[in-house]
Amino acid sequence: MADTPSVAVQAPPGYGKTELFHLPLIALASKGDVKYVSFLFVPYTVLLANCMIRLGRRGCLNVAPVRNFIEEGYDGVTDLYVGIYDDLASTNFTDRIAAWENIVECTFRTNNVKLGYLIVDEFHNFETEVYRQSQFGGITNLDFDAFEKAIFLSGTAPEAVADAALQRIGLTGLAKKSMDINELKRSEDLSRGLSSYPTRMFNLIKEKSEVPLGHVHKIWKKVESQPEEALKLLLALFEIEPESKAIVVASTTNEVEELACSWRKYFRVVWIHGKLGAAEKVSRTKEFVTDGSMQVLIGTKLVTEGIDIKQLMMVIMLDNRLNIIELIQGVGRLRDGGLCYLLSRKNSWAARNRKGELPPIKEGCITEQVREFYGLESKKGKKGQHVGCCVC
């Protein structure tokens, strides 16, 4: 991976994908002769807040919002700028990168301040978030060759999704065969820079061959009232584990606010949805992650992707439009095990997908649907195949 200019990594939620770039960035920051400046982009503002908290711990890296870089230029101190996809696609960011060498030389009177890594987390969204694809168009104008290395990470990007996602942003796509790095260096067609290289895929899920999320107990339950059942589950959780946290995924922004209003008498609640401003989303996410007294986070499906909370013990999903990627991302927040409930009203599971989108998950065995998504071999009849999800 070290010698490959562009890499994509698919690893199960909870694997520790952050450390795949965090440790190399710390090593780059420790170099005395050259200052490397890297950039990390995540899909949503909610995830941005979580990343800023995690990566800024222990003081090993100087971390700042990419908005600072876009508005003011490089400050001479920051090791890692963190932003969202909208920042990555912005003309102002593209222009800053294009003018990097001239700006650095004029401002700092040196050429020893260089662009390091471009890191994109949960990059499957470039292909699967159909309604946002027009927003990603500006990424194709970025000079990828200005960076020393590009790293694309996801817990839900099988080869077909990964290849399409990379091509969406103007890259070559995945390498079609295993290529030795010396072969890449010898190729006359790949001499222009990073964007000319096919991206090498590291599929850690297939290498492990185990169906992800087996550590989480997943229960599909038909109920008369989703909110009432969710309330019962939460009350039971906090009676047994009062220091724990829970996430509830609602189907609409209105439902988010209604649940937050009615549950405040029982729990300390934080709610987030897309109609809030960016600064408010960041503030509320930080409050839920860092304040041990906050118990329940309520939001639409985007609230779960990539967020990492140690005390989280339960995820409840009330949205019957979730596709398999959204399900995996939601369940994957339970890093050390826990309970995931999918609550559906009796005789009401009839969600439809929009054109171009992945279809909603089906009623039935969740493990089997996860296995099919990742292209793993079926082990029907073998002990352990359905641990934590069903008894079929």
From Swiss-Prot:
All residue ranges annotated as the Helicase C-terminal domain in the record: 232-381
Keywords (A to Z) from UniProt: ATP-binding, Helicase, Hydrolase, Isomerase, Nucleotide-binding
Cellular component, GO, one term: nucleus
Molecular-function GO terms, alphabetical: ATP binding; ATP hydrolysis activity; helicase activity; nucleic acid binding
Binding site for ATP: 11-18
InterPro entries: DEAD/DEAH_box_helicase_dom, Helicase_C-like, P-loop_NTPase, RLR_Helicase
Entry EC number(s): 5.6.2.-
Helicase ATP-binding domain ranges (all copies): 1-175
Source species, domain of life: Eukaryota
Nuclease keyword on record: no
Keyword Protein biosynthesis set for record: no
Enzyme class: isomerase
Known function: Catalyzes DNA unwinding and is involved in telomerase-independent telomere maintenance.
Family indicated by similarity: Belongs to the helicase family. Yeast subtelomeric Y' repeat subfamily.
Name this protein carries in UniProt: Y' element ATP-dependent helicase YFL066C
